[in-house]
């Protein structure tokens, strides 16, 4: 169930939120990391850059431009509700627990996932 979208939510939020002055970069970080981590009971292991936290970091390239297309996304579907949307940024690097996982849109390390036990939600 659901719609494809998690792959592009950060770049959409940056393009149509931050770049258009609707939200700040700090708000974007809260929307995409801190608030979900608190909601799912994994904060402060996730959702913050601090000593003892996991160091999950996404670096955005604000100069990269692209167009969302079902032909190029990583979902196992043939459609995308954001088909044709223009993005004014791209994902440069993704670090999971401090390990480089994605570099310029390419997966460089597989199977970095780790089960995380949930606590009480904090939101």
Outline where the language-model segments fall:
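His/Asp/Glu-enriched, well-ordered alpha-helical/loop segment
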Residues: 1-63
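Residue-level signal for well-ordered alpha-helical segments
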Residues: 5, 26-29, 36, 68-73, ...
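Short C-terminal domain-edge/linker segments immediately following a structured domain
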Residues: 7-15, 87-94, 123
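Generic alpha-helical secondary structure signal
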Residues: 18-20, 44, 79, 86, ...
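C-terminal cap of metal-dependent C-N hydrolases
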Residues: 51-116
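Short, solvent-exposed cationic patches
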Residues: 116-123
